[in-house]
Amino acid sequence: MPFAEYFAAVWAGTSAELRGSAGSGVSGTLGDLLVLARELQAPTRLAKETLDEARAVQFPGLDGVLPGFGRQTPNDWGLGLEVRDAKSPHWTGARNSPRTFGHFGRSGTFLLVDPDAGIALACLTDRPFGDWAVDAWPRLADAVLMERGS
């Protein structure tokens, strides 16, 4: 199935649009991002096995650079989802569990899921990713977890 058809099937009923590359060309609303957050917590559109594979570390021990946060040893990733593990510094909060996973981008947007805390956190901004996010995002994630008592 061509990717555009797959995208349309998965995102049916939302305003999400594919405007270019799957890696950086998805546009949508906060509501659309929350649909994805719910799906990543309790899949109904994806097979549970697909989600399990997507959030599982694919190449254990592979080092790399986490944009804005520097070299990470290791820099674990699933299939399109970054896995927090023991990375430091990191864009999620210090209180987030190592099983936390998600993705962020140049648009200043992120989505994380912390399965141990039972939360998802989505953030949309009108500012491109930069130094401001390196400071603000971990503090936001920690504040949400503190508010929940996690």
Predicted region positions:
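Catalytic loop of the DD-peptidase/beta-lactamase superfamily, centered on the K-T-G motif
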Residues: 1-150
